[in-house]
């Protein structure tokens, strides 16, 4: 097939997107596809023209645009197949406040949170105790995220988010091991235990610098925890209306597992978690890419 490989864009996660695209292009080429690289810009008519000239679009995008559902909406309107979730599910997963509300309604355990619009100023105070994680509501890769241990640190943490044009989410800072569990098709992949070698949480450096974190797959946890990780990941995938694949992040708090967020376009760099989980399940990187294309084509066949 002739495949448009879309990467770059203008989000704060552009570098991650481009890094993943290098690996994806190699895999697509090894599978015998003709690859047309495309750096997404605001030229949406140009994007649609390029997409229509291809048989399939592979999205290597993170943040907005990409995980916000914008390219997916344009591709749906053009009738061009792509991998992963559609516009609505993509946006709901990217929007942390919206997705956490859906988790709450579905009785999926998630840390307490407070949403702070960027025009509300920096005087907000959550009604749950310290520590707090302050995050961009629409961001990813832990970019611009701050761990707040003292209340007087909160205004600066909020301003850090607001300065980049996003609303903020203040989340309960639970302690415990970090875990992630991916969904591929209608099955959960083996979960991964994450141990950052430096820092207090799985930040940008831990995620993308080589050997910055120990990522153990399958996670060395009790069978009941593995079963619950699979159940919650599949449930979150369904609640958000996702398809194809996703990856859910968790904290194993003293009270039990807590669902943090779901990624609809998980990282595909050499250090990324989804390829590691797929490898443990017996799928090479090229196998994973082929499966995502297969799922994308099947999903396109279901669209009206």
UniProtKB/Swiss-Prot annotation:
Main location: cytoplasm
UniProt keyword terms in alphabetical order: ATP-binding, Cell shape, Cell wall biogenesis/degradation, Cytoplasm, Ligase, Magnesium, Manganese, Metal-binding, Nucleotide-binding, Peptidoglycan synthesis
This protein's pathway: Cell wall biogenesis; peptidoglycan biosynthesis
GO CC annotation terms, alphabetical: cytoplasm
Entry's EC annotation: 6.3.2.4
Signal sequence extent: none
Annotated residues for binding of Mg(2+) 2: 261, 263
Protein localization: Cytoplasm
Gene Ontology terms, MF aspect: ATP binding; D-alanine-D-alanine ligase activity; metal ion binding
List of residues binding ATP: 126-180
Cofactor(s) it depends on: Mg(2+); Mn(2+)
GO biological process: cell wall organization; peptidoglycan biosynthetic process; regulation of cell shape
Cofactor descriptive note: Binds 2 magnesium or manganese ions per subunit.
Keyword Ribosomal protein appears in the UniProt entry: no
Record PROSITE patterns: ATP_GRASP, DALA_DALA_LIGASE_2
Binding site for Mg(2+) 1: 249, 261
Origin: domain of life: Bacteria
Catalytic activities: 2 D-alanine + ATP = D-alanyl-D-alanine + ADP + phosphate + H(+)
Function: Cell wall formation.
Record family assignment: Belongs to the D-alanine--D-alanine ligase family.
Protein name according to UniProt: D-alanine--D-alanine ligase
Gene that this sequence comes from: ddl
């Amino acid at each position: 097939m002739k495949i448009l490989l879309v990467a770059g864009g203008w989000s704060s996660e552009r570098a991650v997107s481009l890094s993943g695209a290098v690996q994806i292009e190699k895999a697509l080429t090894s599978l015998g596809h003709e690859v047309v690289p495309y750096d997404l810009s605001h030229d949406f008519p140009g994007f649609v023209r390029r997409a229509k000239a291809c048989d399939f679009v592979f999205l290597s995008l993170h943040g907005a645009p990409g995980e916000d559902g914008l390219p997916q909406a344009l591709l749906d309107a053009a009738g061009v197949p792509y991998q992963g979730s559609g516009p609505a599910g993509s946006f709901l997963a990217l929007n942390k406040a919206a997705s956490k509300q859906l988790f709450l309604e579905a009785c999926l355990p998630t840390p307490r949170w407070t949403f702070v619009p960027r025009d509300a100023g920096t005087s907000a105070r959550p009604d749950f105790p310290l520590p707090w994680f302050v995050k961009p509501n629409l961001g990813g890769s832990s970019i611009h995220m701050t761990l707040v241990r003292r209340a007087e640190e909160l205004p600066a943490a909020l301003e850090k988010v607001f300065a980049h044009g996003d609303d903020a989410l203040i989340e309960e800072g639970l302690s415990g091991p970090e875990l992630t569990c991916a969904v591929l098709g209608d099955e959960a992949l083996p979960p991964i235990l994450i141990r950052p070698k430096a820092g207090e949480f799985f930040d940008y450096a831990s995620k993308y610098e080589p050997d910055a974190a120990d990522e153990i797959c399958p996670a060395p946890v009790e069978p009941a925890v593995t079963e619950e990780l699979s159940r919650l990941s599949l449930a979150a995938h369904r609640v958000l209306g996702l398809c194809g694949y996703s990856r859910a992040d968790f904290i194993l708090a003293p009270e039990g597992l807590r669902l943090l967020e779901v990624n609809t376009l998980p990282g595909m760099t050499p250090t990324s978690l989804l390829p590691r989980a797929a490898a443990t399940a017996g799928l090479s990187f090229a196998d994973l890419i082929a499966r995502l294309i297969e799922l994308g084509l099947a999903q396109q066949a279901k669209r009206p």
